[in-house]
Regions:
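Bacterial N-terminal signal peptides that target proteins for export
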Residues: 2-10
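Hydrophobic membrane-insertion alpha-helices, especially the h-region
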Residues: 11-19
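C-terminal motif of bacterial Sec signal peptides marking the signal peptidase cleavage site
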Residues: 21-24
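Bacterial signal peptide processing site
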Residues: 26-28
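Intrinsically disordered, low-complexity linkers and terminal tails enriched in Pro/Gly
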Residues: 30-33
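Extracytoplasmic/lumenal domain signature
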Residues: 35-96, 102, 117-157, 162-276, ...
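Short glycine/Trp-rich loop-beta-loop segment that forms part of the substrate-binding cleft
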Residues: 107
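Short polar catalytic/cofactor-binding loops
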Residues: 111-115
């Protein structure tokens, strides 16, 4: 009760200071009625705030009985509870912990929000008809031979950049403390992890380097993450052990120095220690899944001192071994969801790391789960690949109740795996689905790879841009693409609510697609390869290409 009373004191003071004089100046109400109005208004504010921060119940479903898991708490002095009664500082203001990514001027983690729903869609005027290249930034290339080949530069899967519009006080601090700023440092900045092992910082407007690159040595395949409190922490996952060990990295942008490195986890149930997942901050904690089958919960230390391990969760189904996590944790309130390489969807309570349910979706889940909240209930969208099924199988695209794991609907889409030379290409879903907006608010979009490909086709690695009805799971339309598509689609809405989609494929073709019909409005080869996912601001987007390019495009 003491925490609750502390929480509401600032709200009460703000209301009295700001709204009290407005009511008293009216001159038509008695002091008693005025006091009642103030009390009613404060109660309404408190009720709305409580609805926003109320935690979901930690109800353990029967499916947990089919799991083996281990929870180890390393920090016994710090409560693991996501305490929404606490506030943190953001840009000099108190900000409630339940909304660190909401209303922000930027994309700080993969797909922009904790729901992984790319909610900040772009804005355009009229009907778009072309895509223009605005600038190109060149990365280094590193062709050092590793056990998994060479990786070059540019960015790969998922490789989404970070976009931030820094407040003036943060810019001033950087200018006072950072030795890495260039003459092109500006308020709007792009950050992207590269396959060459560097993190690059780019002026959004000019495409020039805004800081010196930060070297993490090992290739970065996944999407980096900027702390949403804008404290200067940048979180980077290494994906290939060019130099062992690889692990999780935290960089302090105020000093341009590394403040944390996890290294090799000898307690993990899997030896492969890559981190393609884009970490997410919830409250005072950072959650970071690994391909070693472990979910890490870190306490974010004050004053940019890095991270301290709080709790780890290792889990697997009773039947089948442990599997890694390549997708990014999807979060609503205190629930977190992720998929594994052996096809299981897990739900955990972020307070305790206790598993609450699991669902078997049959095959490898690399695409990140997307959450849609309807009347307070979270619903999940998830799809798998054709990997363990053999040469042919189905992409099982499902909608689940996020509270219980119950199946709302599923659609089994036939796909094939292709072997070409020494390489194989799994069918199914790699890209993270996109929730429609505007006139497409009943649809969800996904790039489904190799629905009907075979090795004798002249263009065997094709994909289909697929629209699925969110209510029924039925396919509304399919638009064929000539090459496989791992890049996640992004949306743009115009002044009349018409929804349009930008997506790319592995041959470097860029597409503008009318969301309602699937009609291609524009297509052109615009780079070497699209595997990375874009970040969108207004009518512009930035996305990387394998090779050496980070490119900004404008939708006209």
């Amino acid at each position: 009760m003491k925490r609750t009373s502390v929480l509401y004191l600032p709200l009460i003071l703000v209301y009295i200071v700001l709204y009290g004089p407005l009511v008293s100046c009216n001159g038509h109400r008695s002091s008693s009625s005025q006091e009642q109005i103030n009390a009613d208004s404060i109660a309404a504010i408190e009720k709305a705030h409580q609805e926003d921060i109320r935690q979901l119940p930690a109800n353990i479903q029967p499916s947990v009985a089919d799991m083996v898991y281990d929870i180890t708490q390393f920090d016994t002095l710090t409560s693991g509870r996501i305490d929404y009664a606490d506030h943190i500082m953001w840009n000099g203001e108190q900000k409630n912990q339940s909304s660190l990514y909401d209303g922000q001027d930027g994309w700080f983690t993969f797909r922009g929000t904790s729901l992984r729903n790319a909610a900040y869609c772009g804005r355009i005027d009229g009907i778009p008809s072309r895509i223009d290249k605005v600038w190109t930034f060149q990365t280094s290339q590193d062709y050092t031979q590793t056990k998994l080949g060479t990786w070059g530069g540019g960015s790969g899967w998922t490789g989404q950049p970070v976009y931030v519009k820094w407040p003036s006080d943060r810019m001033q601090q950087f200018r006072q403390t950072s030795p890495a700023l260039t003459a092109d440092f500006a308020q709007e900045e792009v950050m992207v992890g590269s396959l060459c092992g560097m993190v690059y910082f780019i002026n959004w407007e000019t495409g020039k380097a805004s800081r010196q690159p930060f070297n993490v040595t090992n290739p970065i395949k996944g999407s980096i993450s900027l702390d949403p409190t804008l404290n200067g922490n940048l979180y980077i996952g290494q994906g290939i052990p060019k130099v062992a060990p690889m692990g999780q990295v935290a960089c302090n942008l105020n000093t341009h120095k590394q403040t944390f490195f996890s290294g090799y986890d000898r307690s993990a149930w899997l030896a492969w220690g890559a981190f393609d997942s884009s970490p997410i901050r919830i409250g005072k904690f950072l959650f970071w899944p690994g391909e070693n089958g472990t979910i890490y919960k870190y306490l974010v230390l004050d004053d940019n001192r890095g991270l301290r391990l709080h709790t780890t969760l290792r889990l697997k189904p009773n039947r089948g071994g442990c599997a890694g996590v390549e997708n990014s944790l999807c979060v609503f309130k205190n629930y977190g969801w992720f998929g594994t390489n052996n096809g299981h969807v897990f739900c955990i309570d972020l307070n305790t790391m206790q598993p609450l349910w699991h669902y078997d979706n049959k095959d490898d889940i690399d695409a990140t789960i997307v959450c849609e909240v309807v009347n307070g209930t979270p619903y999940l969208y998830c799809g798998c690949e054709v990997d363990r099924q053999g040469m042919a199988g189905v992409c099982r695209f499902v909608k689940l109740n996020g509270l219980t794991g119950e199946e709302v609907w599923y659609n089994e889409i036939p796909c094939k795996k292709l072997n070409i030379g020494n390489k194989h290409f799994d069918g199914g879903l790699y890209s993270t689905p996109l929730l429609g907006n505007g006139d497409c608010d009943s649809l969800i979009f996904a790039n489904i790879c190799q629905r009907s490909g075979n090795a004798k086709d002249p263009k065997p690695c094709r994909a289909e841009f697929t629209a699925i009805h969110r209510g029924t799971g039925q396919v509304v339309y399919r638009t064929q693409l000539p090459a496989f598509a791992w890049s996640s689609p992004v949306g743009f809405v115009n002044e009349t609510g018409q929804f349009f989609v930008f997506t790319g494929d592995s041959q470097g073709n860029a597409y503008l697609i009318e969301g309602k019909t699937g009609r291609i409005l524009f297509s052109e080869k615009m780079c070497n390869n699209f595997e990375s996912s874009p970040v969108v601001v207004g009518n512009e987007l930035v996305v990387g290409s394998r090779g050496s390019e980070i490119i900004k495009y404008a939708i006209r």
